[in-house]
Curated annotation (Swiss-Prot):
BP-aspect Gene Ontology terms: response to symbiotic fungus
Glycosylation sites: N161
Gene (UniProt): LEC5
The protein's name in its UniProt record: Lectin 5
Recorded GO CC terms: membrane
Listed CDD domains: lectin_legume_LecRK_Arcelin_ConA
Length: 282
């Protein structure tokens, strides 16, 4: 299959939608179009990006995100590679994924793996983090004010309003906001920026630039979403494990899209995804 990178949503949708903010309304309509033109009725789906080539991707990017040097860069850097404050970036796999089937009652098992680097580039302060998300096709990403602790997923109007949201995320949160634990943490978020469960994330104990590896999996039988994070080449041998029960059929629509978001606030760090794979079986 030929893979095409989609740098702006307006280039991929009718001109009527080009006037909409590409980070909100048009995303919802865009992914509804994906449901019509770019899904395959199948019991299984898989994709693999060993690296992110700028000219050979099935990836949607928006905000400050871009692909460069084989890397998916979620938030902005300056000309010297240093992280920029108040940056928000977004990416998604270019295809709708069937997570559940109401008629049969089935919910998909899935596993996604990715490698990443979070680097404050010389600073001792981290901020703010990134997330892997699964969102219903009609989920409205915020138009603005989603930087900092909102991680690009929410704004102050939606962050704690679970009735407005239809998204599940695993957050890699490096800055303690008022709704957070008092240290860097990895959390599972269900329709809100406040994690249902979280565990410490020793990002501040890793040498700057260290590559992390994450595996996120969902087991339909147990309904557990499980997260495992490790730094295999780091002298600080600390693994992170967390899991939480989720009934995806009651939280999200049958068809979803998956991807990453990242954000910085006044304090900044880089958020780079080096590789990404995903497999699901319904």
């Amino acid at each position: 299959m030929h893979h095409t990178q989609h740098n702006t949503m307006a280039n991929s949708i009718p001109k009527l939608l080009a006037t909409q903010n590409p980070f909100s309304v048009s995303l919802s309509i865009f992914f509804f179009l994906l449901l019509l033109i770019n899904n395959v009725k199948s019991d299984s789906l898989s994709f693999n990006f060993p690296k992110f080539d700028t000219d050979a991707l099935n990836i949607v990017i928006d905000g400050d995100a871009k692909t460069t040097g084989g890397v998916l860069q979620l938030t902005k850097k300056d000309q010297f590679g240093n992280p920029s404050p108040h940056s928000v970036g977004f990416s998604a796999f270019f295809g709708a994924i069937q997570l559940s089937d109401k008629q049969s009652g089935k919910v998909a098992d899935f596993t996604t793996e990715f490698s990443f680097v979070v680097n404050p580039k010389g600073s001792q302060l981290h901020g703010d983090g990134f997330a892997f998300y699964i969102a219903s096709l009609d989920y409205d990403f915020p138009e603005k004010s989603s930087d900092g602790g909102f991680l690009g997923l929410f704004d102050k109007e939606t962050a704690f309003n679970t009735s407005k949201n239809s998204i599940v995320a695993v957050e890699f949160d490096s800055f303690a906001n008022e709704w957070d634990p008092n240290s860097p943490h990895i959390g599972i978020d269900i329709n809100t920026i406040e994690s249902s469960i979280s565990v410490p994330w020793p990002i501040d104990r890793q040498p700057q630039g260290t590559i992390g590896k994450a595996r996120i999996s969902y087991n339909t039988a147990s309904k557990d979403l499980s997260v495992f994070v490790t730094y295999p080449n780091s002298p600080a041998k600390v693994d992170v494990i967390v899991s939480y029960p989720i009934d995806f059929a009651s939280v999200l629509s049958e068809w979803v899209y998956v991807g990453f978001s990242g954000a910085t606030g006044q304090v900044a760090e880089t958020h780079d995804i080096l590789s990404w794979s995903f497999v699901s079986n319904l």
